[in-house]
Amino acid sequence: MGPLRVFTDNKVKVMLLNPIGGAGFNDFVVETVLNHKDPSTHVTITSLANRIGGNQTLAYPSIRPLLYGEMIRVCLQARKENYDVLIINCFGDPMVDELQQIAGDDMVILGARQVAVQTASKISSKYAVLLPYDMKSSPDPLHQRVVADTRTAVAHPVVDMAFNDDLTPMDGESLGERLATQGKLAIKENGAEVLVLGCTAMVGCWQGLMRAVGVPVIDPTVAALRAAGKAGRLKRELVGGASTKRSGTFPTEKELKMIAESEPSYPFSGRIEI
């Protein structure tokens, strides 16, 4: 993992977590982070420990819970390192609600889908979400949540993505063509005025797609990076203000400390400082 970087300025500290085991996807998003992060932020790109079984664990509902304990430990590690914002870089927004409770007032949790849909809704109520595969008929709870949370979309076109082992797209050029085809149909047939990329593996496609279709395109990773600076600054200004913890039962600080201290530091499979 390498030594932790010591920040000596007052920039907002943002951790972008790719919730998969394996560092390959981290390299895939570096260029986007470099080009589109808020200038007032330091961004750390991370991925979960290799011990969860690799990149594909996220794809299978039966073993996906392996991620959840790891994500809790990442959240506690980020709190320990005084990060202002933790971005969950997956359009499924796994564990976003739970991590908000754990982070409390110490850190803002941003889900990529959450920010992307909010951004699209500010531009127009007529937005379409370009999905990597058919989620509407999927029994997967994470897919059902994506569809439910984007139910105000005018359409959910499917682009039939194929993935490499590290979850990057197999054919970027072909993907761009399918995105343009489905985006144009959503505009023509459903009246979409904004398109939202429905998978963070579509990162880097938004500008070409926007040129092809002529309407705004929201990349969830870019939207979250741009929102992180503002959210982090606001968090610093309002520290000690209203708690972000939800009503209901949540662990005490003592219990969270026991989890955090179960290992010296979290063994990220990859960590890139930008």
From Swiss-Prot:
Belongs to the HyuE racemase family. It is an enzyme of class 5 (isomerase). Keywords: Isomerase. InterPro entries: Asp/Glu/hydantoin_racemase, Iso_Racemase_Enz_sf. Gene3D superfamilies: 3.40.50.12500. Pfam families: Asp_Glu_race. GO terms for molecular function: amino-acid racemase activity. Pathway: Secondary metabolite biosynthesis. Disruption phenotype: Abolishes the production of both oxepinamide F and oxepinamide E and leads to the accumulation of protuboxepin K. The record marks 90 as: Seems to be responsible for recognition and proton retrieval of D-isomers. The lineage of its organism: Eukaryota, Fungi, Dikarya, Ascomycota, Pezizomycotina. Its EC number is 5.1.-.-. This is Epimerase opaE. Epimerase; part of the gene cluster that mediates the biosynthesis of oxepinamides, derivatives of anthranilyl-containing tripeptides that share an oxepin ring and a fused pyrimidinone moiety. The nonribosomal peptide synthetase (NRPS) opaA assembles the quinazolinone core with D-Phe incorporation. The first adenylation domain (A1) of opaA loads and activates anthranilic acid whereas the second A domain (A2) is for activating of L-Phe, which is then converted to D-form by the E domain.
